[in-house]
A protein has these predicted regions:
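Extracytoplasmic cell-surface/polysaccharide-interacting catalytic and binding patches
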Residues: 1-80, 92-172, 180-199
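Segments that shape or occlude catalytic/ligand-binding pockets
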Residues: 83
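Short, well-ordered surface patches within globular domains
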Residues: 86
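Conserved metal-phosphate-binding beta-hairpin within the catalytic cores
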Residues: 177
Length: 199
């Protein structure tokens, strides 16, 4: 069972972000890329297309959303918790360690402590970040000099907001942020997501 979007199982406490009260005020929009065919595999990857994060990550995302709102922006989330089975599906399609974590080691996404996101302006238009989400190219790297000055500034804005809120970043993906201690959280599978809340 669930209460207020909260689920507890052996993996710890998870939140459905669209039901997490602190983020349900419009500061965050969710469009999970792997819940639809609109991703690099060309097909849906998720069995459960709800957007989950662990409590620690959800709290830091709340802080980041507050900081973004001060600048007149809000977030669009492309991905959050990615069950281990989904990580295997992505890896089997494109086994590129620069852009995908080897599922044998485990991804921060598969632990519920990573988020892929961008910034939207007050009209809901995504800021220019120089590449699309999941563009597996060096232009996706932080600090890439081949993108426009405006896109570089937008990436720095996102980096500043997320860093101030306590997130770590991945140097090869401008959209990816994670907690600093991801391996301290257990991996989450589709089977574990289906387990009822523990008392």
């Amino acid at each position: 069972t669930e209460r207020d979007g909260r689920r507890r199982n052996e993996t710890g406490e998870l939140f459905k972000l669209d039901q997490y009260a602190a983020l349900a005020c419009g500061d965050v929009e969710i469009a999970l890329a792997y819940g639809t065919p609109e991703n690099f595999t060309g097909q849906p990857v998720y069995k459960n297309s709800h957007c989950f994060l662990h409590q620690a990550a959800a709290e830091k995302l709340e802080r980041a959303a507050e900081l973004a709102a001060r600048h007149g922006f809000h977030f669009l989330i492309f991905d959050a918790l990615r069950p281990s089975e989904a990580q295997w599906a992505l890896w089997n399609h494109t086994p590129d360690p620069d852009f995908l974590a080897d599922p044998r080691k485990g991804s921060p996404h598969s632990r519920g402590v990573a988020v892929d996101l961008t910034l939207l302006d007050k009209d809901g238009i995504a800021l220019d970040m120089g590449t699309a989400f999941d563009a597996f190219t060096p232009r996706s790297f932080h600090g890439d000099g081949d993108i426009s000055i405006a896109a570089q500034a937008n990436r720095l804005l996102l980096l500043g907001i997320m860093s101030t809120a306590g997130w770590d970043f991945y140097s090869k993906e401008w959209w990816h942020y994670q907690l600093f201690d991801p391996r301290s959280y257990p991996l989450v599978s589709d089977q574990e997501l289906a387990k009822p809340m523990m008392t």
